[in-house]
Swiss-Prot record:
A GO BP annotation: protein ubiquitination
Post-translational modification remark: Phosphorylated. May also be weakly phosphorylated on Tyr residues.
InterPro entries: NuBaID_C, NuBaID_N
Annotated protein name in UniProt: Zinc finger C3HC-type protein 1-like
Length: 477
């Protein structure tokens, strides 16, 4: 009997596959009696189920690598406060590609295996060490997962966030959809600065061609139903703003309810339009009956009721008038208008020490503190403060996050070029929104050649030119 026990106790040492489960089975067989051994086997039989559940975890959750909604929910967990100062190789798109979410400052967590990764970059002067640390973090995005995690072997595909400029039909349908959604905001759309539009090389002719393309796409054609219902707004001013915003990748977030919010579906940036000048606050001349005659600045001031003064300029003038010497003199010399009886009452007023002012009188306190109250008064306006507060124009490019595909060099996938043609094509690549613009203009050009009927083109083009000139007047005033 003793020999049998010794053989049993020695056998685990000789076994090559030593696991906690095997040791438990050997202990139960050699020491515990038969009744308790059965209980031990029952407990041991439950353990493989847990291990099996863990091993089946990749199979159960592997859909996350093919779910676009799950991918962008991970991208949305990154913010500028918790993930700042990272190179493009560690942008949220790359981290979310391998299943990482941002939970704390410079701290990542896997959405499947719950592994943690600290991605802090220490401020060092040695650039080579900095690059080495970045390379280590890039490797850690793939290797820091648990042993049975599926993310290193099956990351998300890049077409989740890439701009598919090689598919013109997809580019056009997405552009028209964004334009239609933005038109629902109507006059709540942000007003665009003429200098910003000019720096983007977007001319009046470009906008006219894009609007013609949208109009042609929305028309019902033979063998094809209309893509959407009629546009929510007929204002050309709304169409121009929505067209430029849609070209730069902006869309409307309907989940926000009544709030006017636009968002970027790529970098998950959300912008509240109440912080910017809106079309309803810009006083443009709506009389577009004579598009052929140019409008001079003098005519623009005569036609506009207030000579086209921006809200920020009105606030500046009101503050200048309030802080002028005449205004301050009138406020500080108001004590001269008191009657002799009132002056005597002021001199006989008891000294107020509750505020620690010593021997200063109450009138002295009021006069001494009035300049501070005047400085704060513009911020204590009534409900009209939202109409007169200085608000800047919306820049459709700078409002994107720095790693957004719309404002970075487009990297198209699925190209058929080979050899030196790949390098030549990569050299010609431009920003994402410009690549989309090329595709849209090429599509519009092909339709114009096939259908030369452009009877309504000159009238709409002149109206677009007219609005662009009015935007230029707004920028110069």
């Amino acid at each position: 009997m003793a020999t049998t026990c010794e053989e049993v106790l020695v056998s685990p040492v000789k076994s090559t596959a030593v696991t906690p489960l095997k040791i438990r089975e050997l202990i139960n067989e050699g020491i515990v009696c038969g009744e308790r051994s059965g209980i031990g086997r029952k407990e041991a039989s439950e353990t493989p189920e847990e291990n099996t559940a863990f091993e089946d975890l990749p199979g159960n959750n592997s859909y996350e690598s093919t779910s676009k909604d799950a991918f962008f929910s991970r991208v949305e967990s990154f913010s500028s406060l918790k993930w700042a100062g990272k190179p493009p190789e560690l942008c949220p798109l790359i981290c979310a590609k391998y299943g990482w979410c941002n939970i704390e400052c410079d701290m990542l967590k896997c959405s499947s295996c719950n592994a943690y990764l600290c991605a802090s970059l220490q401020p060092i002067l040695d650039f080579s060490k900095y690059k080495q640390r970045c390379v280590e973090l890039q490797e850690a995005l793939r290797k820091a997962h648990e042993k049975f995690c599926f993310w290193p072997d099956s990351p998300c595909p890049e077409h989740f966030w890439a701009l598919l400029v090689t598919e013109p039909s997809s580019v056009l349908s997405d552009f028209v959809e964004r334009f239609h959604n933005l038109c629902h905001l109507e006059m709540q759309l942000p007003s665009l600065k003429h200098e910003d539009v000019k720096s983007m090389d977007i001319t009046e002719d470009t906008v006219s061609r894009l609007l013609r393309l949208i109009e042609d796409e929305l028309k019902p054609k033979e063998g094809r139903e209309a893509n959407s219902h009629s546009l929510p707004s007929d204002s050309l001013q709304v169409h121009i703003s929505a067209c430029i915003l849609a070209l730069c990748g902006w869309n409307t977030s309907f989940s926000s309810g009544s709030l006017c919010i636009i968002n970027c579906p790529r970098c998950m940036r959300k912008v509240g339009l109440w912080a910017f000048q809106q079309l309803e606050t810009v006083e443009l001349d709506n009389s577009l009956s004579a598009p052929g005659t140019p409008v001079s600045p003098a005519e623009g001031h005569e036609r506009s009721p207030l000579g086209f003064m921006s809200p920020s300029r009105r606030v500046t003038r009101s503050r200048d008038a309030e802080q002028s010497p005449a205004f301050a003199y009138g406020r500080t010399r108001s004590s001269d208008l008191l009657s002799p009886a009132d002056s005597e009452a002021v001199r006989n007023r008891p000294v107020t020490r509750s505020m620690g002012q010593g021997e200063n009188t109450g009138l002295g306190n009021e006069l001494h503190s009035s300049p501070h109250r005047r400085a704060k008064r513009p911020r204590l306006c009534s409900s009209s403060s939202s109409d007169t507060s200085p608000r800047s124009c919306f820049d459709p490019l700078s409002q994107h996050r720095s790693w957004c595909p719309w404002v970075n060099v487009c990297q198209a996938s699925g190209t058929n070029t080979m050899g030196s043609e790949i390098q030549e094509e990569a050299r010609r690549k431009e920003y994402g929104w410009k690549e989309v613009l090329k595709v849209l203009l090429a599509e519009e050009n092909s339709r114009t050649i096939s259908n030369p009927d452009t009877s309504s083109v000159p009238e709409k083009s002149h109206k677009v030119f007219r609005i662009f000139r009015q935007w230029q007047l707004a920028a110069s005033s």
